[in-house]
């Protein structure tokens, strides 16, 4: 007979962002537990609200699956003496399996006989197994945990009730002072406590008490209600998926409603209005048919439509107060010049161990100058990025950003335009924060991309020099995110960024401009390179790149971000070539021999007069061809290296590299060093797994 089982964890209200990952965790842990316990079922259906996490398991078997297994014991020579008497080891083994020595058989494994017993394990009734779900509940983890009352146990929020019903029967267990029963709670204000007769009644019983327990169904209701309100008023509402998810996890019985605010607030930049509505009040904003922001909003109440107008009025008052503050700051901020704000940055700390924010901008200007020249900006672009670097943090000390910190950069652009700055300068100010997440939008403009790189390079270098290098999960200054941003911008713009060389140039430029911090930045360049390479590894892993290719390209001598990605693509694209194994093995042999050459030998010029066979001359010509091809990029380099593989093989067949004659040996090592240096541009090829 198939059964239905309900498990519900009743809690005080959870933070909205926790609900979805929590229910996913409960489903997975439950499924893993049932699999481990050999219990078959058809489906696990999740239910979640701010006050509950629940799973309904249907098609549940009567009991665990029976199993028969053959258990290996000690070797026969240990289990029996010469007369065939059973040893204590054999007797203890069979007793531990609930059997006797009469049940022993022998099996030979690699020439040695071992004791075996065949063991039958009857499945336990499902009711017994389900009581173990207590451990599933207590094993759950959350981003933040709390204790309550006098208990030492920690959970996301205090557990207030537990329901565990197998069909109509309660499965008894307790967590702290809460014991399972069949009683659950309806909506906090509209419903009442109820007793569930059978597990299958759960969803329907809660609906009757104003709780939509199915999160997907509740989300669909919210979306439908918002769409209807928008259609009724002729609005266009972009229902942001993230906001919809958050609102869905704040309510149990959703009722959407529309509100409005005074049109005078539309003079404020719409980013401020949207931030106030979406981020601070969790409102959905509306636009007209022309895409203009309207003085209206849609919100969702956790309740029914009773006294809804009072709810509308209350929400309008809260939003109006916030917008009134925004209008005040917007007006007051415009009474000062950008120069006034930049002056104030001289008293604002970037970090007390590093510098002020004004000093950071001076460093970033020096770095931006190096980058502008390196990536080939034209005069107008260079002028824009240098001007932006002089002022790009000014909005941090405006009243608006003080109130709406998430608008830093955005308000910088708005105020810069109002004060007559070049639009390219204003855009760069906004874009320098990008990307703000691992997959966030990237700077759209070239000056913005350069300023973003300069700002991020400065932050990482100075924090490293101050000894604040991320370790483990600890990264309070988001340096990993900034390093990822550097990598993604380089990819997006297709800019060569040799990190080691550039970092040295940055430090030199700061020193020349007399803006270098009193920190040993030069001593952190190797750490910076490795830090950037760690981010490259992560991005390549996310792209499902082969692990050996990742190891090869990031262990190579190059610190050029774009070159490393290009090398990975090239190696991956040729990995299935018929000659790939021969090419890599030949080049690896070259590299290993070249590593035996002292630095002064590797740097010497190859002398053809010292060649003793034709293969040396052919290799010499081949290396010259590869060197020429390398100037056209890594793709041409790999093709040339692959083309001379037969030449390399013939060379090794005919030539003893480590000749007794010093001059001949050093000449050969110098040749191989030239070829190895070219091959290493693709990475440490010895890391590749070739078959």
UniProtKB/Swiss-Prot annotation:
GO cellular component, one term: cytosol
Annotated GO biological process: glycyl-tRNA aminoacylation
Top-level taxon in the UniProt lineage: Bacteria
Catalytic reactions on record: tRNA(Gly) + glycine + ATP = glycyl-tRNA(Gly) + AMP + diphosphate
Keyword Protein biosynthesis carried by entry: yes
The keyword Phosphoprotein is annotated on this UniProt entry: no
InterPro entries attached to this UniProt entry: Gly-tRNA-synth_bsu, Gly-tRNA-synth_heterodimer
Subcellular location: Cytoplasm
Root EC class: ligase
PANTHER family attached to this UniProt entry: GLYCINE--TRNA LIGASE, CHLOROPLASTIC_MITOCHONDRIAL 2 (PTHR30075:SF2), GLYCYL-TRNA SYNTHETASE (PTHR30075)
Complex and partners: Tetramer of two alpha and two beta subunits.
NCBIfam families: glyS (TIGR00211)
Family: Belongs to the class-II aminoacyl-tRNA synthetase family.
The protein's name in its UniProt record: Glycine--tRNA ligase beta subunit
Organism whose genome encodes this protein: Levilactobacillus brevis (strain ATCC 367 / BCRC 12310 / CIP 105137 / JCM 1170 / LMG 11437 / NCIMB 947 / NCTC 947) (Lactobacillus brevis)
Gene name per UniProt: glyS
């Amino acid at each position: 007979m198939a059964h239905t089982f309900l498990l519900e964890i009743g809690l005080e209200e959870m933070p909205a962002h926790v609900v979805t990952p929590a229910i996913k965790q409960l489903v997975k842990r439950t499924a893993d537990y049932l699999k481990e316990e050999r219990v078959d079922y058809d489906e696990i259906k999740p239910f979640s609200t701010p006050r509950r996490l629940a799973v309904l398991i249907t098609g549940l078997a009567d009991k665990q699956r029976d199993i028969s297994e053959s258990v290996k014991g000690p070797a026969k020579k240990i289990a029996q003496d010469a007369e065939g008497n059973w040893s204590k080891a054999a007797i203890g083994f069979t007793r531990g399996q609930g059997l006797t020595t009469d049940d022993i058989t022998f099996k030979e494994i690699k020439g040695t006989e071992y004791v075996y017993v065949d063991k039958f394990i009857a499945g336990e009734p499902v009711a017994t197994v389900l009581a173990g779900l207590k451990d599933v509940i207590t094993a759950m983890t959350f981003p933040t945990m709390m204790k309550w009352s006098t208990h030492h146990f920690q959970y996301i929020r205090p557990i207030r009730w537990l329901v565990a019903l197998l069909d109509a029967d309660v499965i008894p267990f307790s967590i702290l002072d809460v014991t399972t029963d069949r009683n659950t709670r309806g909506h906090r204000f509209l419903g009442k406590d109820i007793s569930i007769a059978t597990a299958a009644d759960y969803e329907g019983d809660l609906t009757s008490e104003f709780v939509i327990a199915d999160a997907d169904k509740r989300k669909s209701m919210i979306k439908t209600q918002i769409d209807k309100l928008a259609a009724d008023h002729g609005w266009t509402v972009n229902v942001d998926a993230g906001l919809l998810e958050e609102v869905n996890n704040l309510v149990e019985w959703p009722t959407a409603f529309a509100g409005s605010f005074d049109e005078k607030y539309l003079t404020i930049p719409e980013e401020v209005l949207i931030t106030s509505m979406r981020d601070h009040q969790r409102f959905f904003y509306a636009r007209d048919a022309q895409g203009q922001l309207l003085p209206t909003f849609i919100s969702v109440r956790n309740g029914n439509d009773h006294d809804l107008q009072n709810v509308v009025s209350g929400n309008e008052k809260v939003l109006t107060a916030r917008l009134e503050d925004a209008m005040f700051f917007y007006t007051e901020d415009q009474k000062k010049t950008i120069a006034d704000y930049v002056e104030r940055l001289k008293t604002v700390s970037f970090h007390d161990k590093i510098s002020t924010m004004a000093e950071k901008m001076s460093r970033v200007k020096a770095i931006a100058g190096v980058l502008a020249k390196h990536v080939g900006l034209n005069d107008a672009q260079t002028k824009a990025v240098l001007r932006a670097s002089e002022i790009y943090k000014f909005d941090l000390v405006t009243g608006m950003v003080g109130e709406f910190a998430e608008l830093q950069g955005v308000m910088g652009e708005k105020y810069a335009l109002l004060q007559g700055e070049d639009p390219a300068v204003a855009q760069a100010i906004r874009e320098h924060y990008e990307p703000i997440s691992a997959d966030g939008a990237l700077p759209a403009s070239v000056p913005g991309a350069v300023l973003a790189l300069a700002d991020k390079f400065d932050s990482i270098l100075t924090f490293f020099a101050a000894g604040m290098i991320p370790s483990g999960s600890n990264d309070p200054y988001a340096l990993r995110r900034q390093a990822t941003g550097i990598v993604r911008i380089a990819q997006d713009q297709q800019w060569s960024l040799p990190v080691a060389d550039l970092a040295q140039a940055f430090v030199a430029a700061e020193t020349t401009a007399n803006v270098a911090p009193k920190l040993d930045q030069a001593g952190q360049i190797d750490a910076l390179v490795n830090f950037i390479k760690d981010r490259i590894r992560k991005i390549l892993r996310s792209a499902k790149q082969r692990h050996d290719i990742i190891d090869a390209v990031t262990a190579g001598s190059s610190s050029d971000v774009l070159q490393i990605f290009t090398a990975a693509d090239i190696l991956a694209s040729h990995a299935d070539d018929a000659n790939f194994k021969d090419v890599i093995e030949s080049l690896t042999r070259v590299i290993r021999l070249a590593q035996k050459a002292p630095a002064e030998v590797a740097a010497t010029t190859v002398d053809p007069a010292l060649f003793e066979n034709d293969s040396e001359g052919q290799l010499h010509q081949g290396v010259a061809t590869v060197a020429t091809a390398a100037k056209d990029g890594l793709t041409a380099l790999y093709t040339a290296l692959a083309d001379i593989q037969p030449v390399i093989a013939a060379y090794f067949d005919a030539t003893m590299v480590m000749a007794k004659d010093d001059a001949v040996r050093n000449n050969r090592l110098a040749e191989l060093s030239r070829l190895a240096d070219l091959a290493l541009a693709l990475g440490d090829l010895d890391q590749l797994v070739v078959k």
